[in-house]
């Protein structure tokens, strides 16, 4: 996954890694991670810090080296990309920009995609995604529907 990063991104992440790696030994410990987190206004417990490290500690040595850090950053960026893609997709459906997808908006987009749906089929799609029962699909409902596919 780290292969998808540009040289510029890798250089930026190397700088960030150096900020975490206080003693310059090439690894980030829970202590170093805690120091940086606290400087950013967070107050994680020792267990939370260990969990964060364990999440990316591929070789299981209890610390994060630069390749592990790059892997974490690449994963976070990929999550960010898919979030942006969902927002863009939602905007396509939400034609009037009111933050809700109505049956008419859904029907219009589906028709433009070549899907000829009956009113009942469109209503059924809305009902399936419409968790709060207001007759429209809001962004959270849209995300839940897209992610559960």
From Swiss-Prot:
Keyword set, alphabetical order: Acetylation, Calcium, Metal-binding, Methylation, Repeat
Residues noted as binding Ca(2+) 4 in the record, renumbered to the chain: 130, 132, 134, 136, 141
Protein's UniProt name: Calmodulin
Modified residues (N6,N6-dimethyllysine): 14
Binding annotation for Ca(2+) 3: 94, 96, 98, 105
Domain EF-hand positions: 8-43, 44-79, 81-116, 117-149
Modified residues (N-acetylalanine): 2
Listed result of changing residue 137 to T: In CAM2 (also named PNTA2)
Post-translational modification: The pantophobiac mutant CAM2 is undermethylated on Lys-116.
Gene that this sequence comes from: CAM
Species assigned in the record: Paramecium tetraurelia
């Amino acid at each position: 996954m780290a292969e998808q990063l540009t040289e510029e991104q890798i250089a930026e992440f190397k700088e960030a890694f150096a900020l975490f790696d206080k003693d310059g030994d090439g690894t980030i410990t829970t202590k170093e991670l805690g120091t940086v987190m606290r400087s950013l206004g967070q107050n994680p417990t020792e267990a939370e810090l260990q969990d964060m490290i364990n999440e990316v500690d591929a070789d299981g040595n209890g610390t994060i080296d630069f390749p592990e850090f790059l892997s974490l950053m690449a994963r976070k960026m990929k999550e960010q990309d898919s979030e942006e893609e969902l927002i863009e997709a939602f905007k396509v459906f939400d034609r009037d920009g009111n933050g809700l997808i109505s049956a008419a908006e859904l029907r219009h987009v589906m028709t433009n995609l070549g899907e000829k749906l009956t009113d009942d089929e469109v209503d059924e799609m809305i009902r399936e995604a419409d968790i709060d029962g207001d007759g429209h699909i809001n962004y959270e409902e849209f995300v839940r529907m897209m992610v559960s596919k």
